[in-house]
């Protein structure tokens, strides 16, 4: 049989537990509900990092995320910088004051909080947004 109930990524992050492997999420049927999103993101990131890339010049990127994903995103961006020193990524962890400060998922961070906490700090002029379009996941530079 197939499971119908999965704990969201928040449960693992709040408990300080590792996110389960991809097999745990079966077909990622609850992805839009935040179930398995961190696992999928990390696995896609690591697969992309394993591929060779040509990078010309220095790249500066700002990444904005919520408090829950902040530590993992920071770790991943540090790994990116170690492998590609010409890429300088600054991670901005934004507290969600709009919803009372106790909601840490990045998808619920509001523009109001991003502006209030990042104004004058986003210096690169480049950011990336994860896009789920036509069933395909890709990273869209902005």
Residue ranges and their predicted role:
Residues 1-142:
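Auxiliary Fe-S-binding modules of radical SAM enzymes
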């Amino acid at each position: 049989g197939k499971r119908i109930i999965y704990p969201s990524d928040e449960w693992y992050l709040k408990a300080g537990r590792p996110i389960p492997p991809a097999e745990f999420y079966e077909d990622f049927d609850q992805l839009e509900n935040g179930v398995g999103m961190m696992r999928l993101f990390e696995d896609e990131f690591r697969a992309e990092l394993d591929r060779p890339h040509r990078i010309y010049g220095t790249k500066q990127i700002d990444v904005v995320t919520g408090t829950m994903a902040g530590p993992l995103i920071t770790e991943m961006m540090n790994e990116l910088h170690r492998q590609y020193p010409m890429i300088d990524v600054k991670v901005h962890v934004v507290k969600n004051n709009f919803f009372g400060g106790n909601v840490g998922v990045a998808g619920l961070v509001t523009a109001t909080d991003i502006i209030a906490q990042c104004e004058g700090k986003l210096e690169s002029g480049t950011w990336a947004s994860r896009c789920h379009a036509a069933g395909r996941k890709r990273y869209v530079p902005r």
